[in-house]
Amino acid sequence: EGVRVQDAESAHEFVVRAGCVINATGVWAGKLMGEKPVAGTKPLVAPSQGVHLSFERRLLPTDSAVFWPKTSDARVLFAIPWLGKTIVGTTDTPRKDLHEEPRPLAGEVDYLLREAANFFAVPPKREDILSTWVGLRPLVNPQAAGGGQDTKSISREHTVLVRPDGLVTVTGGKWTTYR
């Protein structure tokens, strides 16, 4: 029938009637569904943090993106020309502490610089970084029992769940396709 909402500024609560309510809240999807931690079960979402670094365009003096399919830890690395700059990414770090404005961990920046140094003629340095940004991927936990928290092996496919009360939850997918 709808949802009970609260105005963040006034704290006033009220009901909004709707024929369908869609939960597309990313890494917070389980929380909105009222999911509570239960021993022996997995939460709906396994949040994963992805970090990108921005450099001057001279790091990648081409109009083409470059993709390295295997880094030292069997992940991938890419460099993309973008808006006159070069983007290098990405990381895949499991997160439980979900901040509305996440920041890169020092180890993630170090990882990207170390891996990029293996592929670029002039290795980028920390002082070359123009900006960083972080995305939180709402990866859907695999249903197989005993699965670990290795987020790099979790599917990036989207999932749609429809509860008996009509709440439709859309989650999963790649951070790069979230819009």
Which residues does each predicted region cover?
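A generic structural motif
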Residues: R4-A8
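C-terminal catalytic lobe of FAD-dependent flavoproteins
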Residues: C20, A29-I87, T93-R179
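A conserved short coil-to-beta-strand element within the FAD-binding core of flavoproteins
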Residues: E1
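Core beta-strand elements of the Rossmann-like FAD/NAD(P) dinucleotide-binding domain
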Residues: S10-C20
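Glycine-rich, N-terminal phosphate-binding loop of Rossmann-like dinucleotide-binding domains
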Residues: T25-G26
